[in-house]
Curated annotation (Swiss-Prot):
Organism from which the protein derives: Komagataella phaffii (strain GS115 / ATCC 20864)
Keyword Ligase recorded: no
Catalytic activity, as annotated: N(2)-acetyl-L-ornithine + L-glutamate = N-acetyl-L-glutamate + L-ornithine; L-glutamate + acetyl-CoA = N-acetyl-L-glutamate + CoA + H(+)
Name the UniProt record assigns to this protein: Arginine biosynthesis bifunctional protein ArgJ, mitochondrial
Pfam families assigned to the protein according to its UniProt record, in alphabetical order: ArgJ (PF01960)
Chain's role: Catalyzes two activities which are involved in the cyclic version of arginine biosynthesis: the synthesis of acetylglutamate from glutamate and acetyl-CoA, and of ornithine by transacetylation between acetylornithine and glutamate.
Annotated S-S bridges: none
Length: 428
C-alpha cells in the first residue's frame, strides 16, 4: 500500500468514526437491504433495495445534464405516468451508471423495475430505479436480475439493514451516508431516514449523487413534490465538490403514511412545518456528501449575506464554491481572499463594491478574522489566518452590502492532489 492509499485508509477510518451513526430512528413501514451481485469487480455491496410495506407518495428531482442516464429516464416516466402515487420500492445498482447506453440501457432499467415488481407482486411500474458508476458501459444485467430476488428476501428494518443499504450505493465514497431523525407535528411523532452517495462530480443542479429519503408521514404527492423541490434547492443544489455535472443524479422522496394522522397537502396547516423539517434534514444529508468529497481535507460553508434576493446570494456563493483557484488555495491553507473577491465579482448578481465585507469564521468559536471591510482590505494577521486554515471546518462570510437583507448558504470542500489520483485511477 503506497503512502497516498495508506493516508486515505486512515482518513476513511476517521470519517467513519465521526459521521457514520451507531443507531437511528427509522420511519415505520419500510424495509431495506443490499447484496453483492457482481456489478463491481470486487466483492463490495453493489445492489440496494428499499421497500415500502404500503404504496407511497413519491417525488424526485433529476439531473439537468442533457445526456440523462437510462434509469433517470425510466424513473421520471414512471412518476409522470402515476402522478407520484403508488410507488412501493426503489432499486439501485452501484459500479455502473447505465448512462449513454442506448435503447439497450433503457431495456435494462425497465427489466430491473419489472423484476422488483414481479418479485414483490407489486402493481406494474411501482418501482423507481437508479444507477451510479462508470458511464458508457452496459450493465451486467443478468447478474442484477438474479440478484434482485436475493436482495429482496434479505430486507429488514434494523439499523444494520439501513447501513448496508447505504453501503450498497457507494462508489468512490469513503463512508456510507445515512441520517435519520424523529419529529412531531401536532403531537404526533413522525420519522425520516435518508441515504446518499456521491464523492465527486458534485455541483449545483444535481451532480453525481444519488439520494433518497423516506418518511412515515402522510404527505400527498403534490405536497411532497413541492417540498422536495424547495428542500433540494437549499441542500443538494447548494453543494459542490468539483463542479462536474453527472448524467445520473436523482434525489427521491417517499411518504407512506404508516405513522397515521391527517393527510398533509399543500394547503394544510402542517405543510410549512414538515417542509422545514425535510429541508433541514436534506441539508444535513447533503453536507455529508461534501465531507466525503474526493480527496477533500476541508469542509467549507460559504455564507453570503445582504443580497438583493436569495437567488443573487446563491449565485455568489456558488461562484466561490466552484472556483478552482479558491478551492486549491484552501487546500494549500493560503488566506488568499483576492480569489474569493474575484469569484464574487464575476457572479451575475448585484454587489455594492464599496460596502462588501469578507471574513473567515473559525470553527472553534473564536473571533472572526476580517479580510475586507466596506471594500477596503484589512491588515491580516497571517499567523492567525494559518491557524484558522488548519481547522477541518471553515465558514467564509461575505456581505454584498446591497441593503437587500437576503442570504444563502453553500457547502463545498478543497481540491487536493488526491482528487487527481482518485479520478485518474477510477476505471482501474
Amino acid at each position: 500500500m503506497n503512502n497516498l492509499k495508506l493516508a486515505r485508509f486512515f482518513a476513511t477510518i476517521s470519517k467513519e468514526s465521526k459521521y457514520v451513526p451507531n443507531s437511528g430512528s427509522y420511519p415505520l413501514g419500510y424495509k431495506v437491504g443490499a447484496i453483492h451481485c457482481g456489478v463491481k469487480k470486487n466483492s463490495t455491496l453493489d445492489l440496494a433495495v428499499l421497500v415500502s410495506e404500503t404504496p407511497a407518495s413519491a417525488a424526485a428531482v433529476f439531473t439537468t445534464n442533457k445526456f440523462k442516464a437510462a434509469p433517470v429516464q425510466v424513473s421520471r416516466q414512471i412518476l409522470n405516468d402515476k402522478n407520484g402515487k403508488g410507488i412501493s420500492s426503489i432499486v439501485v445498482n452501484s459500479g455502473n451508471a447505465n448512462a449513454v447506453t442506448g435503447k439497450g440501457g433503457i431495456e435494462d432499467a425497465l427489466k430491473m423495475v419489472d423484476t422488483v415488481d414481479s418479485t414483490l407482486k407489486n402493481a406494474p411500474s411501482s418501482t423507481l430505479v437508479m444507477s451510479t458508476g462508470v458511464i458508457g458501459q452496459r450493465l451486467p444485467i443478468d447478474n442484477i436480475l438474479k440478484g434482485i430476488p436475493v436482495a429482496l428476501k434479505d430486507v429488514g428494518s434494523s439499523h444494520e439493514d439501513w447501513l448496508r443499504c447505504a453501503q450498497g450505493i457507494m462508489t468512490t465514497d469513503t463512508f456510507p451516508k445515512l441520517v435519520s431523525k424523529s419529529f412531531e407535528i401536532d403531537g404526533r411523532k413522525y420519522s425520516l431516514a435518508g441515504l446518499a452517495k456521491g464523492a465527486g462530480m458534485i455541483c449545483p443542479n444535481m451532480a453525481t449523487l444519488l439520494g433518497f429519503f423516506v418518511t412515515d408521514a402522510p404527505v400527498t404527492p403534490g405536497a411532497l413534490s413541492k417540498i422536495l423541490t424547495y428542500a433540494t434547492d437549499r441542500s443538494f443544489n447548494c453543494i459542490s465538490v468539483d463542479g462536474d455535472m453527472s448524467t445520473n443524479d436523482t434525489i427521491c422522496a417517499m411518504a407512506n403514511g404508516a405513522a397515521g394522522g391527517e393527510e398533509i397537502s399543500e394547503t394544510s396547516s402542517q405543510f410549512s412545518k414538515i417542509q422545514d423539517e425535510i429541508t433541514l434534514f436534506a441539508q444535513q444529508l447533503a453536507q455529508l456528501v461534501v465531507r466525503d468529497g474526493e480527496g477533500a481535507t476541508k469542509f467549507i460553508t460559504i455564507n453570503v449575506q445582504d443580497a438583493q434576493s436569495y437567488a443573487d446570494a446563491k449565485k455568489v456563493a456558488s461562484s466561490i464554491a466552484n472556483s478552482a483557484l479558491f478551492k486549491t488555495a484552501m487546500y494549500g491553507k493560503d488566506a488568499n481572499w483576492g480569489r474569493i473577491l474575484c469569484a464574487v465579482g464575476y457572479a451575475d448578481a448585484d454587489v455594492n463594491v464599496l460596502k462588501t465585507n469578507v471574513s473567515f469564521i473559525p470553527a472553534d468559536g473564536s473571533a472572526e478574522l476580517k479580510l475586507l471591510v466596506n471594500g477596503e482590505p484589512e491588515k491580516v494577521d497571517e499567523e492567525r489566518a494559518s491557524e484558522i486554515l488548519e481547522l477541518e471546518d471553515l465558514e467564509i462570510r461575505i456581505s454584498l452590502g446591497t441593503g437587500g437583507g437576503q442570504e444563502a448558504n453553500f457547502w463545498t470542500c478543497d481540491l487536493s492532489h488526491e482528487y487527481v489520483t482518485i479520478n485518474g485511477d477510477y476505471r482501474s
